[in-house]
Structure formats: structure tokens, C-alpha cells
Amino acid sequence: MLKMSGWQRQSQNNSRNLRRECSRRKCIFIHHHT
């Protein structure tokens, strides 16, 4: 539960960084969590 809460909060702030990095794991994680 805490992880979900943190992810949602970070997703907004890291959404830009994650998209830029778009690592293989991150890309899959985002695609599977979007």
C-alpha cells in the first residue's frame, strides 16, 4: 500500500525523468502501470 502511494506521488514527479530515461525495466514498468 505504501509503495503504491509513493509510486503515484513519484510517478508525477518522475514521469518526466522516467520517460527521458525510459530504461528497459522502467519502460515496461510504466507501460504495465499505465
Curated annotation (Swiss-Prot):
What subcellular locations does the record give?
Answer: Nucleus; Cytoplasm
Main localisation:
nucleus
Q: Does the keyword Cell cycle apply?
A: no
Q: Tell me the disulfide pairings in this chain.
A: none
Gene Ontology terms, MF aspect: DNA binding; DNA-binding transcription factor activity
CC per GO annotation: late endosome; nucleus
Alphabetically sorted, this entry's keywords are:
Cytoplasm, Nucleus
Keyword ATP-binding in the entry? The reply is no
| GO biological process terms, semicolon-separated | artery development; calcium ion import; cell redox homeostasis; diaphragm contraction; endoplasmic reticulum unfolded protein response; ER overload response; gene expression; intrinsic apoptotic signaling pathway in response to endoplasmic reticulum stress
Protein origin, superkingdom: Eukaryota
User: What is its quaternary makeup?
Assistant: Interacts with DDIT3 (isoform 1).
Q: What protein does this entry describe? A: DDIT3 upstream open reading frame protein
